[in-house]
Structure formats: C-alpha cells, structure tokens
C-alpha cells in the first residue's frame, strides 16, 4: 500500500511490528512499518488482512529516521 506523507510516497508492504487487536481471522489492527524511496522508515497504525496492509490511518504516520 502506498501513502503520501509530507510530499513523499511511503510504501507499507506488509511488514508488521505489532498486532494491537484482532477482529476475526482476516482483520487485524497493527503497527505497520514502511519506507520511502530514500530508505527512510516509517511507522503507522493500519489494518492487515493476513497478507496485505489494506488501510493506513494517515494521521498516525511517524518517521523513524
């Protein structure tokens, strides 16, 4: 999943750092890890379906440096 943050495209490709809540077998609230084209890592809360990040809460995106 691709999200724009501060003028950069951030790619969340399924790397999960933590699972916060589970709503059945195919819907998990997670902390997702992504990166931009420069290799900078980002963290955000999102929804994971067991294979892919399906939604990112854009107001939770943080730059990890």
For each predicted feature, which ranges?
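Acidic, low-complexity, intrinsically disordered interaction modules
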Residues: 13-60, 64-65
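Short glycine-aromatic motifs
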Residues: 5-12
């Amino acid at each position: 999943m691709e999200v724009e943050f501060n003028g950069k495209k951030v790619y969340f490709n399924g790397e999960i750092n933590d699972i916060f809540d589970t709503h059945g077998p195919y819907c998990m609230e997670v902390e997702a890890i992504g990166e931009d084209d420069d290799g900078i890592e980002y963290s955000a809360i999102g929804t994971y379906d067991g294979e892919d990040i399906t939604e990112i809460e854009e107001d939770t995106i943080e730059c990890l440096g």
